[in-house]
Amino acid sequence: MRTKIEALFISDVHLGARGVNAEKLIEVLKEYDPEYLFLIGDIIDGWLLKKRFYWQQTYTNVVRKILSYSKNGVKVIYIAGNHDEFLREFLGVDLGNIEIHNEYVYKNIFISHGDLYDGVVKLKWLGLLGSIGYDFAIYIDRKLKKIGFKRSLSKFLKNKVKEAIKFITSFEKQLVHQAKKRNCDTVICGHIHHPENKIIDNIKYLNCGDWIENNSYIIYQDGEFKIHYK
């Protein structure tokens, strides 16, 4: 029997990239019976799919499971991110039980992928360069792990791409500021692949993480948020 919860939050699956832990995500989707499913951006990696098409059957199975949620009455809210920004052409469109938004407020919770407040991603050409390099690094990581190399090249590369821009941005504070502007006391985002649950300036800040390295997600039930790892 699936566990009933009020809301399930997932971000940064990156279907279309190598190394996505799709099987584990499917297990999570089978485990819970939420009233709401919030997909907080970069579920599909449109950037990489434009460059070269990489798709596995398990990726299709993830999409099918999300559609089955919608068919069975779960309200699916899809927040577009920078890697699936093509969906921003369909903002506000209601596809049955699936809605597409740029950002969303649920109760007192501000929900955003977060790319709109990241100075690096605003320079799209550099973000694309980083994405391609990151995808390649994930492939190299998998090879290195087989021979016992533990350090993550993909994490190192992602940090270096961010540092390459001589522009310091406080991602978390930006999101907290946006939550305050909307009179919300909580913000949930993704984008930076860093799961987090903490208080910043009296605002609860949560980040879903990702499904390449952390396999993390957030559940909301009885007024409480919890980050889980698969």
Where are these regions (language model features)?
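Short, Lys/Arg-enriched, disordered terminal segments
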Residues: 1-5, 228-230
